[in-house]
């Protein structure tokens, strides 16, 4: 993959991830002045995850690092724009949720209940369920860690 192709794919990924970030921000009644920042943060998070996955990281660690980035930037923007960090961060991480893995695990569970147990279906179910659970865990931990780092009252030692 050439550099130009990678940059075009990255731009496409960032633009397409900004759209659901704004959509969910509107569902969550985010103020209108914060909508462009939610889009930018969603694009930065998803784009950084794509860059890390292209560099060879697996999707779980890439999601964790991207959600750390989203959480840190969201805390900084909340200080600048006098809003709660969740205004920016929650809608921004929703495009990184593992829809395909969760859907595949659910379909495998339905097939097992309908057709009976088979080892390939069980392997598909467990693999996709564990992947989806790990990604959701990485998102939640990655969003909460910057707040624990930056809002700490006691000394670290």
From Swiss-Prot:
It is found in: Cell inner membrane. One of its GO terms (cellular component) is plasma membrane. Keywords: Cell inner membrane, Cell membrane, Membrane, Transmembrane, Transmembrane helix, Transport. GO terms for biological process: succinate transport. InterPro entries: ThrE_2, ThrE_Dicarb/AminoAcid_Exp, YjjB. Its main location: membrane. It is a multi-pass membrane protein. The chain crosses the membrane at residues 8-28, 55-75, 87-107, 129-149. The keyword Transmembrane helix applies. Belongs to the ThrE exporter (TC 2.A.79) family. PANTHER family: SUCCINATE TRANSPORTER SUBUNIT YJJB-RELATED, UPF0442 PROTEIN YJJB-RELATED. Involved in succinate export with YjjP. Both proteins are required for export. The transporter is composed of YjjB and YjjP. This is Probable succinate transporter subunit YjjB. It comes from Citrobacter koseri (strain ATCC BAA-895 / CDC 4225-83 / SGSC4696). The lineage of its organism: Bacteria, Pseudomonadati, Pseudomonadota, Gammaproteobacteria, Enterobacterales.
């Amino acid at each position: 993959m050439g550099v130009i192709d990678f940059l075009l794919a990255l731009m496409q990924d960032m633009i397409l991830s900004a759209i659901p970030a704004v959509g969910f921000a509107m569902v969550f009644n985010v103020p209108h002045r914060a909508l462009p920042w939610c889009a930018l943060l969603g694009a930065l998070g998803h784009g950084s995850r794509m860059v890390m996955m292209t560099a060879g990281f697996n999707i779980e660690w890439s999601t964790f690092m991207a959600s750390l980035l989203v959480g840190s930037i969201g805390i900084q923007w909340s200080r600048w724009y006098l809003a709660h960090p969740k205004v920016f961060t929650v809608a921004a991480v929703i495009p990184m949720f593992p829809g395909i893995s969760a859907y595949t695990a659910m379909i495998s569970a339905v097939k097992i209940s309908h057709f009976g147990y088979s080892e390939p279906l069980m392997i598909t179910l467990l693999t996709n369920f564990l992947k989806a659970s790990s990604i959701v865990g990485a998102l939640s931990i990655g969003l909460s860690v910057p707040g624990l780092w930056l809002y700490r009252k006691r000394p670290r030692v």
